[in-house]
Protein backbone atom coordinates (compact mmCIF):
# COMPACT_ATOMS: atom_id res chain seq x y z
CA UNK A 1 0.00 0.00 0.00
CA UNK A 2 1.10 3.55 -0.75
CA UNK A 3 0.21 6.81 0.95
CA UNK A 4 -0.71 10.12 -0.66
CA UNK A 5 -1.95 13.60 0.10
CA UNK A 6 -4.79 15.16 -1.90
CA UNK A 7 -5.50 18.89 -1.71
CA UNK A 8 -8.92 20.41 -2.11
CA UNK A 9 -10.33 23.84 -1.47
CA UNK A 10 -13.03 23.16 1.12
CA UNK A 11 -15.44 25.63 -0.50
CA UNK A 12 -15.18 23.50 -3.68
CA UNK A 13 -14.97 19.97 -2.18
CA UNK A 14 -14.66 19.32 1.56
CA UNK A 15 -14.16 16.28 3.76
CA UNK A 16 -17.81 16.65 4.84
CA UNK A 17 -18.98 16.48 1.22
CA UNK A 18 -16.78 13.42 0.72
CA UNK A 19 -18.43 11.81 3.76
CA UNK A 20 -21.93 12.53 2.42
CA UNK A 21 -21.39 10.62 -0.85
CA UNK A 22 -20.92 7.46 1.19
CA UNK A 23 -19.21 4.21 0.22
CA UNK A 24 -19.75 4.67 -3.54
CA UNK A 25 -17.07 7.36 -3.35
CA UNK A 26 -16.47 10.33 -5.62
CA UNK A 27 -14.18 11.11 -8.52
CA UNK A 28 -11.05 13.06 -7.61
CA UNK A 29 -10.93 15.10 -10.78
CA UNK A 30 -9.92 18.50 -12.07
CA UNK A 31 -6.20 17.82 -11.68
CA UNK A 32 -4.48 19.56 -14.60
CA UNK A 33 -0.87 19.68 -13.43
CA UNK A 34 1.20 16.97 -15.14
CA UNK A 35 3.18 15.97 -12.05
CA UNK A 36 0.01 15.71 -9.96
CA UNK A 37 -1.72 13.76 -12.76
CA UNK A 38 1.24 11.37 -12.94
CA UNK A 39 0.87 10.81 -9.19
CA UNK A 40 -2.80 9.94 -9.73
CA UNK A 41 -1.72 7.37 -12.33
CA UNK A 42 0.55 5.70 -9.75
CA UNK A 43 -2.25 5.17 -7.25
CA UNK A 44 -3.50 1.65 -6.59
CA UNK A 45 -6.79 0.41 -5.23
CA UNK A 46 -6.57 0.40 -1.43
CA UNK A 47 -4.00 3.21 -1.20
CA UNK A 48 -4.77 5.73 1.54
CA UNK A 49 -4.70 9.50 1.10
CA UNK A 50 -4.67 12.37 3.53
CA UNK A 51 -7.42 14.86 2.69
CA UNK A 52 -5.96 18.37 2.92
CA UNK A 53 -8.06 21.54 2.99
CA UNK A 54 -6.09 24.14 1.05
CA UNK A 55 -6.53 27.92 1.05
CA UNK A 56 -9.12 27.84 3.86
CA UNK A 57 -7.78 26.09 6.93
CA UNK A 58 -4.56 24.75 5.40
CA UNK A 59 -4.73 21.50 7.33
CA UNK A 60 -5.01 17.75 6.94
CA UNK A 61 -8.54 16.92 8.05
CA UNK A 62 -9.16 13.30 7.09
CA UNK A 63 -8.33 10.13 5.21
CA UNK A 64 -9.81 8.72 2.00
CA UNK A 65 -9.16 5.42 0.24
CA UNK A 66 -8.59 4.89 -3.49
CA UNK A 67 -11.37 2.60 -4.76
CA UNK A 68 -10.83 3.01 -8.51
CA UNK A 69 -7.49 3.57 -10.22
CA UNK A 70 -6.76 6.26 -12.80
CA UNK A 71 -9.17 6.76 -15.68
CA UNK A 72 -9.73 9.49 -18.25
CA UNK A 73 -12.39 11.70 -16.76
CA UNK A 74 -15.40 12.49 -19.00
CA UNK A 75 -15.01 16.23 -18.34
CA UNK A 76 -11.58 16.24 -20.03
CA UNK A 77 -12.48 16.75 -23.67
CA UNK A 78 -8.84 16.45 -24.75
CA UNK A 79 -8.45 13.07 -22.95
CA UNK A 80 -5.10 14.07 -21.42
CA UNK A 81 -5.79 14.01 -17.71
CA UNK A 82 -7.04 11.40 -15.30
CA UNK A 83 -9.10 11.05 -12.16
CA UNK A 84 -9.30 8.40 -9.46
CA UNK A 85 -12.27 7.48 -7.30
CA UNK A 86 -11.92 7.79 -3.53
CA UNK A 87 -14.16 7.01 -0.59
CA UNK A 88 -14.24 8.53 2.87
CA UNK A 89 -12.43 6.57 5.61
CA UNK A 90 -12.28 8.94 8.58
CA UNK A 91 -11.78 12.42 9.90
CA UNK A 92 -8.64 13.03 11.91
CA UNK A 93 -9.29 13.38 15.63
CA UNK A 94 -7.39 16.66 15.50
CA UNK A 95 -6.67 18.34 12.13
CA UNK A 96 -2.95 18.78 11.46
CA UNK A 97 -2.17 22.30 10.28
CA UNK A 98 0.44 23.24 7.73
CA UNK A 99 1.96 25.44 10.43
CA UNK A 100 2.46 22.45 12.74
CA UNK A 101 3.81 20.31 9.90
CA UNK A 102 6.40 23.00 9.17
CA UNK A 103 7.41 23.04 12.85
CA UNK A 104 8.12 19.29 12.89
CA UNK A 105 11.75 18.73 11.85
CA UNK A 106 10.96 15.13 10.85
CA UNK A 107 8.57 16.46 8.18
CA UNK A 108 10.87 19.13 6.72
CA UNK A 109 11.32 17.28 3.42
CA UNK A 110 7.72 16.35 2.59
CA UNK A 111 6.30 17.64 -0.67
CA UNK A 112 3.63 19.64 1.14
CA UNK A 113 6.43 21.99 2.20
CA UNK A 114 8.93 21.51 -0.65
CA UNK A 115 6.37 21.61 -3.50
CA UNK A 116 3.58 23.63 -1.97
CA UNK A 117 1.70 24.12 -5.27
CA UNK A 118 1.43 20.39 -5.99
CA UNK A 119 -2.12 19.11 -5.39
CA UNK A 120 -1.45 15.34 -5.40
CA UNK A 121 1.71 14.07 -3.73
CA UNK A 122 3.20 10.90 -2.28
CA UNK A 123 3.70 10.59 1.48
CA UNK A 124 6.23 8.09 2.78
CA UNK A 125 5.30 5.66 5.56
CA UNK A 126 7.40 7.46 8.18
CA UNK A 127 5.73 10.81 7.49
CA UNK A 128 2.29 9.16 7.36
CA UNK A 129 2.81 7.73 10.86
CA UNK A 130 4.15 11.02 12.24
CA UNK A 131 1.14 12.96 10.93
CA UNK A 132 -1.28 10.37 12.32
CA UNK A 133 0.42 10.68 15.71
CA UNK A 134 0.18 14.48 15.51
CA UNK A 135 -3.57 14.19 14.85
CA UNK A 136 -4.19 12.31 18.09
CA UNK A 137 -2.71 14.93 20.41
What residue spans do the PLM features occupy?
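Charged phosphate-binding loop/patch that engages nucleotide di/tri-phosphates or the phosphate backbone
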Residues: 120-137
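Compositionally biased, charged N-terminal/linker segments
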Residues: 1-43, 135-137
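Short, charged, solvent-exposed linker or helix-capping segments at domain edges/interfaces
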Residues: 17, 95-101, 132-134
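Loop/turn positions that initiate beta-strands
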Residues: 46-47
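Short acidic/glycine-rich loop or secondary-structure boundary segments that cap or lie
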Residues: 14-16, 58-60, 74
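Aromatic- and Lys/Arg-enriched surface recognition patch
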Residues: 61-121
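Short, charged beta-turn/beta-strand-edge "cap" motif at the junction between a beta-strand
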Residues: 52-58
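Short, acidic Gly/Pro/Ser/Thr-rich loop/turn segments
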Residues: 11-13, 93, 130
Amino acid sequence: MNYWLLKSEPNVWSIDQQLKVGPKGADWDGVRNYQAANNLKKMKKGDLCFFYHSNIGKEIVGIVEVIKTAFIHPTDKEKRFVAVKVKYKSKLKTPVSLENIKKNKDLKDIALIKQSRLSVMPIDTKCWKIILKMSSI
